[in-house]
Amino acid sequence: MGNEFDISNAGGLVPMVVEQNARGERAYDIYSRLLKERVIFLIGPVEDYMANLVVAQMLFLESENPDKDIHLYINSPGGSVTAGMSIYDTMQFIKPDVSTVCVGQAASMGALLLAGGAAGKRYCLPHSRMMIHQPLGGYQGQAADIEIHTKEILNIRQQLNEILAKHTGQDAETVARDTDRDNFMNGTQAVEYGLIDAMLDKRPVS
């Protein structure tokens, strides 16, 4: 169950891993092999196809072992709110804890998904960048329809702010103010804000 959206962006050059056992050899693409280790990649813009793959992988891993953590690695500029919310809701719905790790960037919806990981298990690597802001609009059409869409985007903004407030420990007013414009954070700032729990230099010793 590899991440085809990652593969296409890499020009089709996907490393293969060959495993040997008593029954012979089996080749996996690198993403499928890491899925066996309960590692999922959320790479690139958040859109419906990518979200479906991530959701499917989480549900599969829950069916395999509902008591073992899932590790979600995020490097995303954000994207579709509805696609992102399908991932977020699944993260909250399934039994396993979902540990989130930012590698590169987690902006907009990517930052919300990073913050939505299991409490105490949200991380970034040292040179990662996080960014939170309000959802973007841009609907064109009749005045009545524009008014409808304006109300909807304001409702979505409030919903996203409430989610960020829940996971960061900030109050809703603070989040509303801090997301009014693009708000970039490094790892230290993200920890202080409550977006993540720790910045990792090395993999923790198990």
Curated annotation (Swiss-Prot):
It is an enzyme of class 3 (hydrolase). The keyword Cytoplasm applies. Its EC number is 3.4.21.92. Keywords: Cytoplasm, Hydrolase, Protease, Serine protease. The active site is at S108 (nucleophile), H133. It is found in: Cytoplasm. It comes from the Bacteria. One of its GO terms (cellular component) is cytoplasm. It catalyses: Hydrolysis of proteins to small peptides in the presence of ATP and magnesium. alpha-casein is the usual test substrate. In the absence of ATP, only oligopeptides shorter than five residues are hydrolyzed (such as succinyl-Leu-Tyr-|-NHMec, and Leu-Tyr-Leu-|-Tyr-Trp, in which cleavage of the -Tyr-|-Leu- and -Tyr-|-Trp bonds also occurs). Belongs to the peptidase S14 family. Cleaves peptides in various proteins in a process that requires ATP hydrolysis. Has a chymotrypsin-like activity. Plays a major role in the degradation of misfolded proteins. This is ATP-dependent Clp protease proteolytic subunit. The gene is clpP.
